[in-house]
Every structure is written in C-alpha cells, then in structure tokens.
A protein has these predicted regions:
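Conserved small-residue
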Residues: 304, 387, 404-502, 533, ...
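Low-complexity intrinsically disordered tracts that form flexible linkers/tails across taxa
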Residues: 34-58, 429-435, 565, 570, ...
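Short, surface-exposed beta-strand-loop junctions and turns on beta-sheet-rich folds
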Residues: 127, 486-487, 528-530
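Acidic/polar loop-and-plug regions of large Gram-negative outer-membrane beta-barrel proteins
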Residues: 35-102, 322, 475, 483
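C-terminal beta-signal and adjacent terminal beta-strands/loops
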Residues: 282, 515-631, 656-714, 722
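Extracellular/periplasmic, surface-exposed regions of secreted and cell-surface proteins
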Residues: 12-21, 26-31, 39, 76-134, ...
Length: 723
C-alpha cells in the first residue's frame, strides 16, 4: 500500500533593463504525495514480535479476528496467537497519506553604479505546505486530518566594491538582511473510535472530536554584514568581516534581553611562490600560508526564553474540562547568545604542474555560553533549566592529498586521499551542573543504562554507564548466581562511570579515477576508525539467541564445555553448552550446590567451585539470558563496540560520446554515465554484520543503534545532453 509520487519544475528568467540595471527571477515548485511510508521493522526481530523461524509469507494474511479487528485469544479466534498480527493488520488496514507542496521563489535586482561599485537587492521565500490524512481501523480508531505549513522569507540588499590602485587591491561588500520564519499547524481527529467503522469523517467520532491548531512558532532576525578585502601585489591578502544580528528568539516578554550580538572575523594569506617567484623552483606551482580567526554567534529556538503554557482537555462524563499547564522548563533572566571562537592555520602546496597537491589545516575552536538544558529536582515544579552551559573545545587536523601518478595523451590516473581527526574537551560547565549533562540516552535509567554526556575534563559525548561489571578491591570481576538456572552472570557495578568515547579516532576517504580518452572509471571509499556505539539489536538479539554472537558456547564446535550433571533433577544428563565466566562471587551470594545444600560462596572463585565439584558450568542460554536482558545488561563488546568500517561508497563509469554522434542528435555534447552507490563494506568491525551506518540520527551526541537497518544501495543511469 505504499507509494510515492513527485512532480517538480524550475523556471529561471533574466532581463537587462538598461546598461546598468538587470533583474533575475526564479521559481522552484515541487509537489509530493507519499502514502504509507515504509516502517522500521528492525526491532521486531529483537523485541519478541518475530522469531528466527518466522515465515512472513505464511503469517501475513492470518491476523483478522472473527468479530473484526485484530485476532484475539479472549474471543477464541484461531489466529489469536499469530506473532506480529497487529503489525500485519496495520500494514493492511491503516492508511497514512500526505501531500507536500514546496514553493521557492527568488528575485534580485543588480545595479552597476560605477565601474567599481555595485548594488544588489534580493528576496526569496521558502513555502512548505503539508497536508495529512491518517486512517486507522480497529480498536481506538482515529481519523487524523490536518496540515502544517512553514513560511521562510529573506530580504536583503548589498553594496559591493572592487578597486585596484597600483599594487593595492581593495574590495568588499556591505549587506543587510531581514529573515522571518513562521510555522502553523492545524489538526482534527476522532476520539474513542467511530460510530460506523470505516466511514472516514470526523463527525463520525464516538466522543467529541478533538482539534488543535494555530501559530506554533515564529522568529525574525535582522542582520547587518560587512566585508573588507585587501591585497598587495597578488602576494599578500587580508580579509576582515563583521556581522550583527538582532534575533527575536532572545527577546523577553518585557522587551529586554541579549538579542543583539556582533561577531567579527579576520583572515590572511601569503602566496610564497609569488614573493619568491624568481628563486622558486619551477616545479612548485603554489605555496600558500593561511591563518584565520573568527567568531560566530547563535541564538536559540522561538519562545525558549519566555514562559509558555500548554492547552489541553480532560474528558468527563458530562463533557470536557479545559486545562492550562505551564511548561516544565525553567527560564533564566539573562540568557546570552552562543559564541564560537575559532582559529586555524594551513598550508596549500601545488607541485609538478598540479600533479601532487597537499592541503593541511590545524584548527581549534571554543564554544562559550552554549545554550543547553540541565536537569533540576522535580520538587521545584520544573524538570529542566535552560542555561548558558559553559566552554566546549574542539581541535583537530584536516589533510587532503591529490595526486596524478599517470598522465599521458590518452591515459590519466588520479588518486586522492583525505584524513580528518577531531578531539573535543569540556573545559567548563554551568555551576548548577553537579557532575555531567546527559546529551543522549540515559546513564542509569530505562533499558538504556548508557548515555553520552558533557562532563568537565572529558570529551564531548563521552559515554557513561552504571552497568559496567562490578569488581572487588583487587580488580577481580564479580559474579552473581541464578539458582533457578544454576548459572553465574556478571554483577552490575550500579555506579556511573566513563566507559569510552564515541568520537572516531579519525575519518578518511580514498578516491581514484582512471581515464582513457573519453571513458572514465571512478571508485570512492569512505572510512571511519574508532569510537564506540551501543547496539540494542545486538543486546536483545543475543539474549534471545537470534544473533551469530549467541552461538558461542552453544556446543563443542563453538567452545561449549561438555559435562554430566550431578544435580538430583538432572543427574546423568550430558550437556555440551557449558562455560565458566571469570571472577568471584559478590558478597552475600548463596548458591545451591550439587549435593543439594546451600552455601555462602561470597568471594569464592567460580572456576574453583566447579573444579571441586560443588557447582557445574553455566549453560550458554542462562549466560545470555541473564547478561543481555532488559535492565540486566553489562557493558561488553557485543553490546558496546568500537565502530570501524571501510565503505565502498561509489563506482561510476562515464563515457562522453564523440561529437560526430552528439551533433547528429542535435546536441553540442552527450554524456552517458552509470553510478552505483553504497555497495557494501570492505571492512566492518560490528558483530553480527550490523549496518555500521545505522546510528539512530546525525546528532553529534548520538551513539545508539536500535534496530536491524538493512543495507541500501542505489543504481543510477544518467544521460547528460548540452544543446
């Protein structure tokens, strides 16, 4: 039932009014109609919905109950125990439709005042209109119909100047901008089901229909910008810029606030090869030193600095009661805009007619007054406080090496490399932060028990957890005993501590292009090495025995121990799935021995107790069930793993047809190309062949893989014609 259609067009026009004024305009329009977007079914394989022997072709039509709706055992439906029946019902009976319209018009006027002074006025708008209609059949039916739209408009004007006086060059611009964005949302839906199932109109609601709508957010910004460019003898250049923003997002209800903020920059470069042109070796084409310092300011979300409230209803037997509630985010009276101060130095080197080129950059940046939310005691009536958090530092290097090892009349081989390495550090945080700020996940709650945090002295996004394996005063791992399964498992530390860093050691790429006459082949690799991720599909899939990792110790072939049980209820049975974890039992551990007696095994070695015949090896199923269950997990390489990969990102074949052929077809030039992207991984460090690029989001603090996301490749054939 899922489809996607899109229609789009782009129109551009220019016109010269006279010798010194010309105008240009364009409109970009697209209309998309997605229906029933694909669902993320990856978690179904680890949350118990589907088992490894699940046959979707067999079960996909066995979900309906006799009285209608999803099959249920309490109605005596024959398909009441079908796994995943709700999923199949929703796939078949739910209907989610959207219609997205995007319009982006632009307009500009260019005026040539003198030979060295120009003026430009421009305006653009980004209009996004989304309408949705959701139909859900079944218990708690809902027919959600609504839309939301976003307007973004920008108006600007700028003066540009360029003037050369003997050995000196002066240029630059002065510009002003006005930016406005507004977001509206409207929705209406049924409540409590429908009077007549399958009749899709909101007045068919059993209970009074619910609606919501209005202006959700609005922000305006005024900006004044200037740039000054100076040059001397085409050797030395100096650029100075400045910008002042006035943001409505930092204006308090009483019209105060730090809504105006200025941030400058300065950069310089020296072309060494021009200064020493007479003495420079001929094989050096370019040698440039560059350095810069810049400051960037940033505001926050609309309404973030002002107290707001939510509007809701409570359903009563005689109608609805309308309620208002203040938000749970505490505001501060003097929120400052964020500031990022950065500097960098670099070298650009071109040699051998640009066949060997090197770009090197070292940078360092500090973000101060970063706007973040910190947790506060709920007894205060709020749950979080918006603050200027502190000082976050980033530094690193970037290297690009471009080479052409072979270049002849018909052949050319290009080989390019990039390398980037970034390191971050939390220099300081807000005084109200006792230890750390959680950025993503939860250090000691829910099924997470691991989170990326901001902690003074550590990297941004360092990972902390309270479920590392506990150890005694001598550093020996501690174990617990499960008497029902007669097996040991790792004891949790219950103390939050740093377990690693999510930041990669480095990122890199390799691209090579081989060209023979008009035919070329390009291959691109991307790579990442280092940095931790937490895979919950590995965690729960291993607990349930659905991953390759859970095969270890299952039988002798996979390292399992063989023994004959001496417990009374299993005496004489031979098992082949045994393992003996390293460690001693934690204080207060009582275990039932082989002879049926109970014994305090605190501080005793599990391996020694097995050797003495008092306990037996732990079954593999018990080990995985206890160590990887919801809330019982402990940090190990299956759940939290170093992420490294080499991706085969792109293969492209391009052929430029001879002019004799393209001219016959009425074209000046004709190119044919075939591209294949994301073809797979030459190296992948994650267990169980997980997709290494399936981290939940692109956030700088995200480290989680929640489901089995499939590998997706794309194949594109392109015809490019010039007329």
């Amino acid at each position: 039932n899922n489809t996607f259609e899109r229609y789009s067009f782009l129109v551009k026009a220019t016109h010269k009014l006279n010798d010194w004024v010309d105008v240009a305009a364009s409109v970009n329009f697209s209309n998309s109609t997605p229906r029933n977007a694909a669902r993320n079914i990856g978690e179904n394989f680890v949350n118990g919905t589907w088992t490894p022997n699940y046959d979707p072709q067999y079960f996909r039509n066995k979900y309906l109950g006799e009285p209608g709706g999803v099959a249920r055992t309490d109605y005596g439906d024959i398909y009441g125990n079908v796994p995943g029946k709700t999923y199949w019902f929703e796939i078949d009976k739910y209907d989610y439709r959207q219609k997205e319209t995007v319009v982006r018009p632009t307009f500009e006027v260019n005026m040539k005042i003198t030979d060295w002074l120009k003026f430009k006025a421009d305006a653009n708008m980004n209009y996004y209109y989304n309408r949705g209609d959701n139909k859900e059949l079944g218990t708690g039916y809902a027919n959600d119909g609504g839309y939301y739209k976003i307007w973004q408009t920008t108006f600007g004007g700028s003066f540009t100047w360029n003037k050369t006086i003997k050995d000196y060059y002066i240029g630059g611009f002065a510009r002003f901008e006005y930016y406005n964005t507004s977001r509206y949302e409207y929705s209406v839906n049924t409540d409590g089901g429908m009077v007549v199932p399958g009749q899709w109109f909101v007045d068919n609601s059993k209970n009074p229909k619910k609606s919501d709508g209005g202006l959700k957010s609005e922000k305006r910004m005024l900006s004044a910008i200037f740039a000054l460019n100076l040059g001397w003898k085409n050797q030395v250049y100096l650029d100075v810029t400045g910008r002042n923003d006035w943001s409505s997002a930092l204006v308090y209800a009483n019209r105060t606030g730090n809504h105006s903020y200025f941030y400058p920059s300065v950069s310089g470069s020296w072309l060494i090869n021009e200064t020493f042109r007479e003495s420079m070796p001929s094989w050096i084409n370019l040698a440039k030193l560059r350095a810069s310092w810049a400051q960037v300011g940033n505001d926050t979300d609309p309404y973030a600095v002002n107290q707001t409230y939510s509007f809701a209803t409570m359903e009563m037997y005689d109608g609805n009661i309308y309620t208002n509630e203040l938000d749970k985010l505490m505001k501060i009276a003097d929120l400052k805009p964020e500031r990022k101060n950065s500097w960098e130095i670099g070298l650009d080197f071109r040699t051998f007619n640009n066949r060997l080129n090197l770009d090197f950059t070292y940078y360092k940046e500090n973000t101060t007054d970063q706007i973040m939310k910190i947790n506060v005691p709920a007894i205060s009536g709020v749950t979080q406080q918006l603050v200027n958090a502190g000082n976050i530092q980033n530094s690193g290097i970037e290297i690009a090496l471009n080479t052409t090892p072979i270049k002849t009349k018909d052949w050319q081989w290009d080989l390019d490399f990039t390398y980037t390495r970034n390191r971050s550090k939390i220099v300081s945080l807000h005084p109200n932060v006792a230890n750390y700020i959680e950025l993503s996940g939860y250090v000691n709650a829910y099924d997470y028990h691991i989170g990326s945090v901001a902690k003074v002295g550590e990297s941004y996004g360092v990972l902390m957890s309270d479920v590392t394996q506990a150890r005694n005063e001598n550093g020996v791992p501690l174990l617990e005993w499960d008497d029902s399964w007669r097996g040991a498992y790792r004891a949790q530390s219950k103390t939050a501590e740093v377990v690693g860093n999510m930041t990669p050691d480095f990122l890199g790429s390799v691209a090579t292009t081989l060209t023979w006459k008009d035919l070329s082949l390009n291959v691109g690799l991307d790579m990442r090495f280092g940095g931790l991720v937490a895979s919950y599909c590995n965690l729960y899939g291993t607990q349930a025995g659905w991953t390759e990792s859970s095969l270890q110790y299952r039988d002798p072939e996979h390292g399992g121990m063989t023994w004959t049980s001496q417990y009374a209820d299993s005496k004489g049975i031979q098992y082949t799935d045994g393992m003996i974890p390293e460690g001693v039992f934690k204080e207060g551990t009582i275990a039932t021995l082989v002879d049926g007696t109970k014994m305090d095994v605190s501080g005793l070695s599990y391996a020694q107790l097995v050797q003495e015949g008092k306990l037996e090896p732990t079954h593999a199923g018990s080990w995985y069930g206890n160590n990887y269950a919801w809330g019982a997990q402990t940090i190990d390489d299956i759940w939290v793993h170093k992420l490294s990969y080499i991706a085969l990102r792109n293969i492209t074949i391009n052929y430029r047809l001879p002019n004799s052929i393209s001219h016959k077809l009425g074209a000046k030039g004709l190119n044919l190309s075939f591209s294949a992207r994301n073809l797979g991984y030459l190296y992948n460090s994650l267990p169980n062949n997980l997709n290494p690029e399936s981290v939940r989001s692109n956030s700088a603090s995200e480290f989680r893989i929640r489901g089995f996301e499939p590998y997706t490749a794309s194949y594109i054939f392109t015809i490019n014609a010039n007329f």
